Amino acid sequence: MNEKQRIESGQVNPSDKKSEKDYSKYFEAVYVPPSLKDAKKRGKEEVKYHNDFKISEQFRGMGEGRKFYIRTYGCQMNEHDTEVMAGIFMALGYEPTDSTEDANVILLNTCAIRENAENKVFGEIGHLKALKKDNPDLILGVCGCMSQEESVVNRILKKHPFVDLIFGTHNIHRLPELLSEAYLSKEMVIEVWSKEGDVIENLPKVRTGKIKGWVNIMYGCDKFCTYCIVPYTRGKERSRRPEDIIQEVRRLAAEGYKEITLLGQNVNAYGKDFEDMEYGLGHLMDELRKIDIPRIRFTTSHPRDFDDHLIEVLAKGGNLLDHIHLPVQSGSSDVLKLMARKYDRERYLELVAKIKKAMPNASLTTDIIVGFPNETDEQFEETLSLYREVEFDSAYTFIYSPREGTPAAKMKDNVPMRVKKERLQRLNEVVNEISAKKMKEYEGQVVEVLVEGESKNNPDILAGYTRKNKLVNFKGPKEAIGQLVNVKIHQAKTWSLDGEMVGEAIEVK
């Protein structure tokens, strides 16, 4: 519904019409930058569950003869959100396209975790300006985490007024209404909720592939690490009910999926918001391991919530994979305190020791930030020493990127960028060294590989992943795609393994 229609329907008075620069009418709450103080108040509000999602008949057929294109940036949660939006588009009658030139609607599903991710999005918006000029009927939308930031919305309003639609992470289920308004309105349509949404079940999905599937188990994060924008862009922790998750996993198993990954900004906090029962991630994993699906992973973990019961359940093995991504961020207790991670170096190492005792062959990977405000040489050396002590299989490493509205962004930073880059290089040298050492141990071994498709570099070579998430390239028949096979490793590289398929595909019982 556009402004004129709203006035005619009596929903607003003409005198209430805002000036061109005042878009507050589109926001459910007052439009302000992320606030740590206000965000922490949110835990008092009850989360509501909705199992009756339906697309109104008035919107069905909206997409007949039209095509949509979604470009996804960032984490697995964004990929999952894209699957949901694609499902809604298809239910509206749209067809997918891989080309922006063929699309009638283009959505950029954005990431706000680092400045570099935001720059990529703004670069893409700039590239699409010419396309929009040539095709004025094209609907160009920006959604995802960046849309939850005041500075981003203001920048789009000021510098990219040709964008038609902006919506956030909490109202994806309102995509039909938002598209309808974008078609009718002559102004930019903006709907960003400061308050996080409820848990909406039965949303349609168009999954990418039939081999591996994402299963969202919770939304949001309440940890408020001082450097992180996610608690503001994704809202408070809200867990899906276990029965809904179990039903979804059973359905994927029946459809022939070989692997699922449980998703959440902090999966280890799963269930902590339930008021009617004591039920955590360990309980959920214990139920899921009984389902006839070969592989179950989860990401991402927070060390603070990684409890003994979860370790006990994971140690049962079976379809619960012994690959754990456990972000440490820094090896210095002082830096961890400034980050508000709520654990120190010793506690993290104790957790690692518990995991390795229960699962001696577990593969551990991590995330590390270098160049946090005022990080000293000694504190950085502590990160290097912790990495060597744990011997992670691999790591995602980053230079600290300040995010507007977070406490860390207000800290005075005396670490020059030159020093930050040098530290990142030194850390990556250690990461590569230990990864190469770990991969070398696979030479001569036979490993189970879930074959995902042809290698990106050579169509005559197949590629897949081991139970411990190691990339394997090997020679084998195309019929093996989508199957579990045994591969003998001949050569180890820093980040991948080369081998040859041995025997037939593994029968999954």
Curated annotation (Swiss-Prot):
What keywords are annotated for this sequence in UniProt?
Answer: 4Fe-4S, Cytoplasm, Iron, Iron-sulfur, Metal-binding, S-adenosyl-L-methionine, Transferase, tRNA processing
What superkingdom does the record give? Bacteria
Q: Where is the Radical SAM core domain?
A: 207-437
CC cofactor: [4Fe-4S] cluster
Residue numbers binding [4Fe-4S] cluster 1: 75, 111, 145
Where the record annotates domain MTTase N-terminal, the positions are 66-184
Where is the protein localized? Cytoplasm
Q: Cite the EC number.
A: 2.8.4.3
In terms of Pfam families, this protein maps to: Radical_SAM, TRAM, UPF0004
Is Iron given among the entry's keywords?
A: yes
Q: Where does the TRAM domain start and stop, copy by copy? A: 440-503
Work out whether the entry's keyword set contains Transferase. yes
InterPro entries on file: Elp3/MiaA/NifB-like_rSAM, Methylthiotransferase, Methylthiotransferase_CS, Methylthiotransferase_N, Methylthiotransferase_N_sf, MiaB_methiolase, rSAM, rSAM_horseshoe
In which broad location class does this protein mainly occur, judging by the first location in its UniProt entry?
cytoplasm
Instruction: Point out the coiled-coil segments of this chain.
Output: none
User: Which Gene Ontology molecular function entries are recorded, alphabetically?
Assistant: 4 iron, 4 sulfur cluster binding; metal ion binding; N6-isopentenyladenosine methylthiotransferase activity
GO CC terms in record: cytosol
Binding, [4Fe-4S] cluster 2: 221, 225, 228
Q: Which SUPFAM superfamilies match?
A: Radical SAM enzymes
Catalytic activity reads: N(6)-dimethylallyladenosine(37) in tRNA + (sulfur carrier)-SH + AH2 + 2 S-adenosyl-L-methionine = 2-methylsulfanyl-N(6)-dimethylallyladenosine(37) in tRNA + (sulfur carrier)-H + 5'-deoxyadenosine + L-methionine + A + S-adenosyl-L-homocysteine + 2 H(+)
Oligomer and partners: Monomer.
Family membership noted in the UniProt record: Belongs to the methylthiotransferase family. MiaB subfamily.
Q: What does this protein do?
A: Catalyzes the methylthiolation of N6-(dimethylallyl)adenosine (i(6)A), leading to the formation of 2-methylthio-N6-(dimethylallyl)adenosine (ms(2)i(6)A) at position 37 in tRNAs that read codons beginning with uridine.
Name of the protein in its database record: tRNA-2-methylthio-N(6)-dimethylallyladenosine synthase
Which species is listed as the source? Bacillus licheniformis (strain ATCC 14580 / DSM 13 / JCM 2505 / CCUG 7422 / NBRC 12200 / NCIMB 9375 / NCTC 10341 / NRRL NRS-1264 / Gibson 46)
